[in-house]
Amino acid sequence: MAHELTVQELEKFSADFNKNPKNKVVARAAQRSGVLEASYNDRVQSELTRVFSTELDTDNVTNQKHSGRCWLFATLNVLRHEFGKKYKAKDFTFSQAYNFFWDKIERANMFYNRILDSADMPLDSRQVKTDLDFAGTDGGQFQMAAALVEKYGVVPSYAMPETFNTNDTTGFATALGDKLKKDALVLRKLKQEGKDDEIKKTREKFLSEVYQMTAIAVGEPPKKFDLEYRDDDKKYHLEKDLTPLEFLHKYLGGVDFDDYVVLTNAPDHEYDKLYGLPAEDNVSGSIRIKLLNVPMEYLTAASIAQLKDGEAVWFGNDVLRQMDRKTGYLDTNLYKLDDLFGVDLKMSKADRLKTGVGEVSHAMTLVGVDEDNGEVRQWKVENSWGDKSGAKGYYVMNNEWFNDYVYEVVVHKKYLTDKQKELAEGPITDLPAWDSLA
């Protein structure tokens, strides 16, 4: 039912506000320093520590800078922990630019696939509009990184260093997005006119142009490189003329992405069900995005078990909530906004997802956990925002934040129950691109 605000109502609102003298004190603090600073809970500093009962041997952090490549950084961070542990080279890093290059090409190909598949839909249909809205962007999921690594391998960071356009993807993403949207109109018209032969030639031309744009912005990937590093014992290692796939299979052959499952906690969806996100798959004919939705305690138990076995855990989360970038605190009580405004802002995890308040905005890596008599107190988190953020790039997260704002963890299937193992291999319920899990 429509309601029109009246002068009398507005005068009453003002009178109610001014009735309480504390409101003016709070208002001055908020207006001078911002609502987050004014509501900052100093007690968090004494409640979160940097000591963990289980902790991996960590190294220097990476820095995604002004890009949406957290999903790729977190995946390569998990792999570099494995490499560092196996070969005693904890400061060794993989090139994010290398896999980013191939993601641009593969994702463009998938975009053209979707545009052709939806050519009979109106241009303003939700499906087509969503595909167009995300053209050229660089956010992603764990399986997207896994698909790229499986198909193209990995290279050391020195073999394909970062460039201006990988550190700040804004300009390139805009240019690529514009091109893809322009191409979409051409491909839709050809499909609607039934010109299949012309579609094949045109798509190939468009993909060649995407390759050209990406090579100009990022640089062409190396076909071979020399593996050269000094391990933690200062011993020198050199192996010449490795291809990226040879490097992957020889040095990380024990990592099989098929052995890993993404457990998700989405209370707005049915539990014990395997969901897919086909609109986000980035490599045609490769690893699909699959999420097994289970109660939160299973994400906790599997993550702890994997950490205790010495393996890092990729996790998807909403880092934009209750986070202090400077200190690296992730705590549900960090900003007391309810107290500042005098209103109840609390929502359940399910309601946050339903309304778009909650989202998977970031991916990081779990590298430690602190338990006290079986109760989880806090987690150690490796971020990819450089060493000027948090404690030399590492964050500390209380368990309430984990429960409220973590939505996905990637764990080996050996940590699943028998029922969950069956579900992970079972039928997939595909979700649309606008679903809360997308």
Curated annotation (Swiss-Prot):
<dbReference type="InterPro" id="IPR025660">
    <property type="entry name" value="Pept_his_AS"/>
</dbReference>
<feature type="active site">
    <location>
        <position position="383"/>
    </location>
</feature>
<dbReference type="Pfam" id="PF03051">
    <property type="entry name" value="Peptidase_C1_2"/>
</dbReference>
<keyword id="KW-0788">Thiol protease</keyword>
<comment type="similarity">
    <text>Belongs to the peptidase C1 family.</text>
</comment>
<dbReference type="GO" id="GO:0043418">
    <property type="term" value="P:homocysteine catabolic process"/>
</dbReference>
<keyword id="KW-0645">Protease</keyword>
<dbReference type="InterPro" id="IPR038765">
    <property type="entry name" value="Papain-like_cys_pep_sf"/>
</dbReference>
<feature type="active site">
    <location>
        <position position="70"/>
    </location>
</feature>
<keyword id="KW-0378">Hydrolase</keyword>
<dbReference type="InterPro" id="IPR004134">
    <property type="entry name" value="Peptidase_C1B"/>
</dbReference>
<protein>
    <recommendedName>
        <fullName>Aminopeptidase E</fullName>
        <ecNumber>3.4.22.-</ecNumber>
    </recommendedName>
</protein>
<dbReference type="GO" id="GO:0005737">
    <property type="term" value="C:cytoplasm"/>
</dbReference>
<comment type="function">
    <text>Can hydrolyze internal peptide bonds in Met-enkephalin and bradykinin; however, hydrolysis of alpha-, beta-, and kappa-caseins is not detected.</text>
</comment>
<dbReference type="GO" id="GO:0009636">
    <property type="term" value="P:response to toxic substance"/>
</dbReference>
<keyword id="KW-0031">Aminopeptidase</keyword>
<dbReference type="GO" id="GO:0070005">
    <property type="term" value="F:cysteine-type aminopeptidase activity"/>
</dbReference>
<dbReference type="GO" id="GO:0006508">
    <property type="term" value="P:proteolysis"/>
</dbReference>
<dbReference type="InterPro" id="IPR000169">
    <property type="entry name" value="Pept_cys_AS"/>
</dbReference>
<keyword id="KW-0963">Cytoplasm</keyword>
<feature type="active site">
    <location>
        <position position="362"/>
    </location>
</feature>
